Amino acid sequence: MYNIIIIVLSILAVTAALVFAAHFLPSRKLDLENGSPYECGFDPLNSARVPFSFRFFLVAILFLLFDLEIALLFPFPQALFIFNSSHVLYIATLFLAILLIGLIFEWTQGGLDWAE
């Protein structure tokens, strides 16, 4: 019981010391550069409607889909010890075959061609 009281009091003391230091220590003066917004190198006063490559968007969505599907493969090694291993291997092979068919389809449709 006394340990909890000591911990709470020490946390309160550290918090009070930090608040006291933040209140009484001098703050830095802001100049023009510190007061202006920084938008990753873009001018924030221009229009936000910039052209965006649909090709990049398609590749990003495909990456997310295939990444999620690959993450679904993580439980299969553990399932080999729990269930019938031939059944689990059949399901994993079927799952990978579906992924491969989807990848080949996207490749033949030109979804992975970066330059046209």
From Swiss-Prot:
Keywords of this entry: Electron transport, Membrane, Mitochondrion, NAD, Respiratory chain, Translocase, Transmembrane, Transmembrane helix, Transport, Ubiquinone
Family under the similarity heading: Belongs to the complex I subunit 3 family.
Entry GO terms, CC: mitochondrial membrane; NADH dehydrogenase complex
GO MF annotation list: NADH dehydrogenase (ubiquinone) activity
InterPro entries: NADH_UbQ/plastoQ_OxRdtase_su3 (IPR000440), NDAH_ubi_oxred_su3_sf (IPR038430)
Function per UniProt: Core subunit of the mitochondrial membrane respiratory chain NADH dehydrogenase (Complex I) that is believed to belong to the minimal assembly required for catalysis. Complex I functions in the transfer of electrons from NADH to the respiratory chain. The immediate electron acceptor for the enzyme is believed to be ubiquinone.
Membrane-topology annotation of the record: Multi-pass membrane protein
Broad enzyme group: translocase
Catalytic activity: a ubiquinone + NADH + 5 H(+)(in) = a ubiquinol + NAD(+) + 4 H(+)(out)
Gene3D superfamilies: NADH:ubiquinone/plastoquinone oxidoreductase, chain 3 (1.20.58.1610)
Pfam families: Oxidored_q4
UniProt-annotated location(s): Mitochondrion membrane
EC identifiers of the protein: 7.1.1.2
Keyword RNA-binding: no
Protein name: NADH-ubiquinone oxidoreductase chain 3
Transmembrane stretches, start-end: 4-24, 56-76, 88-108
